[in-house]
Structure formats: C-alpha cells, structure tokens
Amino acid sequence: MRSFVRHQLWPAVALLLAITVITGFIYPLAVTAVGQVVFPNQAAGSFVAGTDGRAIGSSLIGQAFSDPKYLWGRPSAAGADGYDANASGGSNLGPTSQALIDRISAEVDRLRTANGDAPIPVDLVTTSASGLDPDISPAAADYQAARVAAARGIALDLVRQAIARHTDGALLGFIGQPRVHVLAVNLDLDGLVR
C-alpha cells in the first residue's frame, strides 16, 4: 500500500496540483499581464471613447440603432430585445421556421419603409452567429446612405465619405469580406470621434 501511495498516487496528485497552479493561475495571470502591456485597449474591452473621454461603446460589440439619422446594423437575436452581450448567440431557427420567416418579413418591411424599394442587402435581414456583429457590408451601408443624409440634412457625399473612412478591406487582402463599422460611422457623422 505504501508503495502504491509513494509511486503512483503521490506523483498523480503532485502533477494535478502543478498543472492546476500553472494553467489556473500562472498562465492566466501571465497572459493578462502581457495583454495589458502589449494591447491595453483590447485587453480592456476595446472601448470607444467620446470627446469627453467617456466610454460610449465597444468596437467589438454591435449596438442597436433605430434613429433614421444613423446607420443600422444587422438584426440581433442576442437576448429578448437584441444586442444583449450576456445572451450572445444566434436564434437557432431553421430556414423553414415560421418565426424566422415572420422576423425577416418584418425586417424587410421596416427597411423598405425607411429606405425605399431598392434591393436589400442580405446582411440587413439576417443575424450573425453571435448576434453582436458591429459591422455591415459596404452594400448595406450604401443602401442606407440616402436615408441617413436626408435625416441629417447633409449631402449624400458626406455620408459616403464617412462610410469610406470606416470601411476595412479583407484581412491581408484575401481573408474575409470588406466591412463597415456601424458605430464608427455613426460617431463620425455625429462629430463625436474622428
């Protein structure tokens, strides 16, 4: 029995404790420390600050905009009212789900009422996997540009310039699609962040 404890049980318990300390304490603390030093903004949540320095959003999490003077992001299925970071996730509704069909139909009606009868980009009626996507396609931004310009009483070209300033291309030129950051465009148009 003593041989079993000394040769098998004690090394197993010691290894368990060592791995617990390394992976549960040392590694997370080291990664957090490196993150705070090398990427302080990202480690703190990638907050976007207004001109007064106060956090007004995050560059990683979408927000609900419904005022006609703002670009609207993708619909969100995260939480009861959407854009709930505590309930991140898609709707899990299948393509034959009547609830999904009704939601998309209502979104199409809302967009047509606000923007006219132009073809609606698909990302304005479909949710992302997380339900918190902060970006839309350039086509979705351009689709809304005339509405935003009219609601603000500014030239359409000024809205398109703001969209162009906050459009990122594909990563490394070939990974992913070009995307427009909704919050950044809206803040730019408000003159809050440059």
Protein language model annotation of sequence segments:
Residues 19, 138, 142, 179-183:
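Short alpha-helical patches at coil-to-helix transitions and adjacent helical residues
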Residues 147-194:
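Extracytoplasmic/periplasmic C-terminal soluble domains
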Residues 7-16:
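Residue-level signature of transmembrane alpha-helical entry/exit and packing/kink sites
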